[in-house]
Regions:
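Long, solvent-exposed non-transmembrane regions
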Residues: 5-25, 58-60, 78, 273, ...
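Intrinsically disordered, low-complexity regulatory segments enriched in Ser/Thr/Pro
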Residues: 71-130, 183-187, 197-250, 254-263, ...
Length: 547
C-alpha cells in the first residue's frame, strides 16, 4: 500500500511568522507539549496513584504520586515544608519554597524518598543522580489556597468565580530537566517513546504537581473538592528572562516546532469540506473561546485593554465560523482572518488545529531535534552573500549606528547563572555579552564580505569573529524558521514575546505579564484529573469555568 500524502496549502512565510509581534500573541494548541503528554496518558488509560503520604495536619511532609506510562513507572516525590510569608517569592534569588519536587525514574524506595526530602528543598545546591529526571519547586497562591481551605473546613465548596479568576493553588518557579544541577541527562530517556517528545518529562512532572496540589489542599481543608472545580485548578508558573534565550540557542529545535505548527495549519487549510458534526463542533468551540476570553483578566492596564480588544474582535469575527461555506471552509475562515489583528489570527490558528486532530496530531513526533545543526558549508562567499540576501534582508535594514538599535546586551549573572539584560551605554559588563545579537553579527559579517568570491574558510581566517554569524546563516538556509527575525538588542525588543511563544508550545494559558521581562501563566487548567485519563477527556483547550 502506498503511503498517503496529506494535502496542504503553502506554509506561511518565515518572515511573517518569525516576528516577535506575532510570536508574542501565540496561543496553545493541540500540538502543545502538555496536551500531547495528556493524550498519551489518556490513550494508555493511565492511573495516577498516591503510593506514599506522610503529611501532618498542616500539610507538611512527603508524598509520592506514581503513574505507569509506556510500560514504565514514574513517580513524583513531593516535599512540603513550612514557609514564612515574607520568604515566599517567585524571584530566582529565592532560597526557600513551599514545596520541592523530583520526578523519579521508577518506584522510589524509602531511602530514595528520604534522600529527596533532604536534597530537593536545596534545589541548585542539592545533590542528585541519574534516576532524578526533573527538579522543580513551587509556592502556594495564598489567596486561593486559604479560601479553599477555609471553605472545605466550613463544610462547603469554594466560590467557582475565585477559582476561575486565579486558576491555580501552586505556582512553580522552576522546572529543571535535561541534566541541570546533576539530574539525569536527556539521552538516558530520549529513546523511550513516552518521553521522546519535547519537554515530555517536564510536562509529566507538571501534571503530577497539579495532582499533588489538589490532594494537599483537600488534606489540609479536611474535605473534598467538587470534581468540576478540581478540574479547573491548574498549575501556575512564574517565568522570567531565564527562558527567553532558549529560542535563540536552540535554532533547529525552534524551527521544528514552528514547521510542525505551520504544516498543521497548511494541512487544515487544504481540507475541501467538513461534515455537519465538525461544523457544530466549531460553533461550540467559538463559544468556548468567547467564554475563555471573558474570564481572562490581568492587572496591567495595557495588557487588560489588549485582552478586551481581542474579546470584542472575536465577537465581531465569529459569524464567519457560524456560517461556513460548503467548499474549502477553513481556507475561507483563514482568508477572513487576514483582515484582523495578528492576535486574532493566531487564535484562529489554534481553533482550526483543535478540530483537526486526525490529520495533525502525528506532527508532534517531528517537534524534537535529535541531531542538532549539521554543517552546511557554502561553496564560497558568493553563496554566503546570496543566503544573507535571501534570508537576512531584515537584519541588513537595521541601522546599528543608532544607539537604541544596540543598547541592550544579554549576559549571564554570576550569582544565579541566569540570563539578564543590561544597558551597554549605562552599565558595565558588555564585554561579557552572550551572543544573542544575531542580526548585528550577520550585518557585520555581510559588511566584511569580499567583493570577489573566495572560500568561506579564507574569509573566516581573515575575520574569525564572524564564525558564529556564518553558522547561523547556514542553519537558517536549511531551517527557515530557525531565527527570530527581529533585533534582540534593540530597546524595542520585548523579551515577554519570546516567553509567550515558548510557553504557548508548553500549553500555557491565562498569560499575565508583570512587565516586559516576566509573566505568570497557568498550565493544565481544565485537564483531566489523575483518575479521569480516557480518550473522551481530551477536550480541554481554552477551558471555561461554569459560574
Amino acid at each position: 500500500m502506498k503511503d498517503m500524502v496529506t494535502p496542504q496549502r503553502p506554509l506561511r512565510a518565515p518572515q511573517d511568522v518569525m516576528r516577535l509581534a506575532r510570536m508574542g500573541v501565540m496561543m496553545p494548541t493541540r500540538l502543545s507539549f502538555l496536551r500531547v503528554l495528556t493524550r498519551r496518558l489518556c490513550a494508555e488509560r493511565a492511573q495516577v496513584q498516591r503510593t506514599h503520604w506522610d503529611m501532618c495536619a498542616d500539610g507538611f511532609g512527603t508524598a509520592v504520586h506514581q503513574v505507569t506510562l509506556g510500560g514504565r513507572t514514574y513517580a513524583l516525590i513531593s516535599v512540603s515544608k513550612p514557609l514564612d510569608d515574607s520568604a515566599r517569592s517567585d524571584r530566582v534569588i529565592a532560597t526557600a519554597w513551599d514545596a520541592a519536587f523530583v520526578l523519579f525514574d521508577g518506584v522510589p524506595s524509602a531511602a530514595d524518598i528520604a534522600r529527596v526530602a533532604t536534597q530537593a528543598p536545596r534545589q541548585e545546591a542539592g545533590r542528585f543522580g541519574p534516576r532524578d529526571l526533573v527538579l522543580s519547586r513551587a509556592n502556594k497562591s495564598m489567596r486561593l489556597w486559604s479560601e479553599i481551605v477555609a471553605a472545605l473546613r466550613a463544610g462547603h465548596q469554594p466560590a467557582p468565580a475565585r477559582i476561575g479568576e486565579i486558576g491555580y493553588i501552586m505556582r512553580t518557579t522552576a522546572v529543571y530537566g535535561n541534566g541541570k544541577f546533576g539530574i539525569a541527562d536527556r539521552h538516558l530517556v530520549a529513546d523511550r517513546p513516552e518521553l521522546s517528545g519535547a519537554f515530555a518529562a517536564e510536562m509529566l512532572a507538571v501534571y503530577l504537581i497539579r495532582q499533588f496540589s489538589l490532594d494537599l489542599v483537600q488534606h489540609v481543608g479536611q474535605g473534598t473538592l467538587d470534581r468540576a472545580l478540581s478540574r479547573h485548578i491548574g498549575v501556575g508558573n512564574a517565568t522570567g528572562l531565564g527562558m527567553a534565550p532558549f529560542l535563540v540557542t536552540h535554532p533547529v529545535l525552534l524551527n521544528n516546532w514552528m514547521v510542525a505548527r505551520e504544516t498543521a495549519l497548511a494541512r487544515v487549510r487544504a481540507v475541501p469540506d467538513i461534515p455537519a458534526t465538525t461544523r457544530a463542533r466549531i460553533t461550540t468551540l467559538a463559544t468556548r473561546v468567547a467564554g475563555h476570553l471573558s474570564q481572562w483578566h490581568v492587572p496591567g492596564p495595557e495588557d487588560e485593554a489588549a485582552l478586551r480588544a481581542l474579546e470584542a474582535e472575536w465577537a465581531a469575527f465569529r459569524h464567519h465560523l457560524d456560517d461556513l461555506p460548503r467548499q474549502d471552509p477553513y481556507e475561507h475562515v483563514w482568508s477572513c482572518a487576514q483582515d484582523h489583528s495578528v492576535a486574532l489570527q493566531e487564535l484562529v490558528v489554534a481553533l482550526l488545529l483543535e478540530v483537526n486532530g486526525d490529520i495533525i496530531d502525528g506532527l508532534a513526533e517531528c517537534m524534537v531535534d535529535p541531531f542538532g545543526a549539521p554543517p552546511q558549508p557554502f561553496a564560497g562567499t558568493g553563496a554566503l552573500r546570496d543566503a544573507i540576501g535571501r534570508d537576512w534582508g531584515w537584519a541588513l535594514d537595521i541601522d546599528f549606528d543608532d544607539p537604541d538599535a544596540c543598547r541592550r546586551f544579554w549576559y549571564v549573572s554570576a550569582d544565579k547563572l541566569e540570563p539578564r539584560l543590561g544597558d551597554r551605554f549605562a552599565e558595565d559588563g558588555a564585554e561579557l555579552e552572550t551572543p544573542l545579537d544575531i542580526a548585528r553579527r550577520v550585518a557585520q559579517a555581510h559588511a566584511d564580505l569580499p567583493r570577489t568570491d573566495q572560500p568561506v574558510s579564507a574569509f573566516l581566517r581573515d575575520f574569525p569573529q564572524h564564525k558564529h554569524a556564518v553558522d547561523r546563516i547556514a542553519i537558517c538556509a536549511r531551517h527557515p524558521y530557525a531565527e527570530i527575525r527581529d533585533n534582540l538588542i534593540a530597546t524595542t525588543c520585548r523579551p515577554i514575546d519570546m516567553l509567550r511563544c515558548k510557553l504557548s508550545f508548553f500549553g500555557a494559558t491565562k498569560f499575565d505579564p508583570k512587565s516586559d521581562l516576566w509573566t505568570r501563566i497557568t498550565l493544565a487548567q481544565g485537564a483531566p484529573l489523575g483518575d479521569e485519563l480516557t480518550d473522551e477527556r481530551d477536550d480541554w483547550w481554552l477551558p471555561v469555568m461554569s459560574v
